[in-house]
Amino acid sequence: MRTYDFSPLWRSTIGFDRLFDLVETAQRAGEDNYPPYNIERVSEDRYQISLAIAGFSPDEVSVTAEQNAVIVEGNKADKAEREYLYRGISARPFKRQFNLADYVQVQSAAFENGLLKIELIREIPEAMKPRRIAINAAPSGTVHQLEGRAA
């Protein structure tokens, strides 16, 4: 009997009920882990993605919001050929995609201290929100006779 681990498929999803499970399984996925990132729930309907992209300038990074996804791409421009004795700061190009749940939208993106922070918000339309329906009761003294009425 074969077993399949589908946890890598859920690695970059935001706004789903199993958010904490998804973050846990992200560490076990075998794909490229560059750049490292955090996904945190700021409040009930707000999330933040933080990507560690030290060495990149805001001009070298793009954030694109599509239907149910956020795509972050970075491409470091080679300025001049340098001879490195040791190169520990990564400058390789990257592309990272985060899948979003329904009604989760990108609110803003900011670059601060080598971290790209993407703010997300879940805005459920008013028509989709649950609403309370008032129950009207008939006055207790009135009895309606249904028989004997003309149809």
UniProtKB/Swiss-Prot annotation:
InterPro entries: A-crystallin/Hsp20_dom, ACD_IbpA/B, HSP20-like_chaperone. The keyword Phosphoprotein does not apply. Residues 28-138 form the sHSP domain. Keywords: Stress response. Disulfide bonds: none annotated. GO terms for cellular component: cytoplasm. It comes from the Bacteria. Pfam families: HSP20 (PF00011). The keyword Cell inner membrane does not apply. Belongs to the small heat shock protein (HSP20) family. This is Small heat shock protein HspH. The gene is hspH.
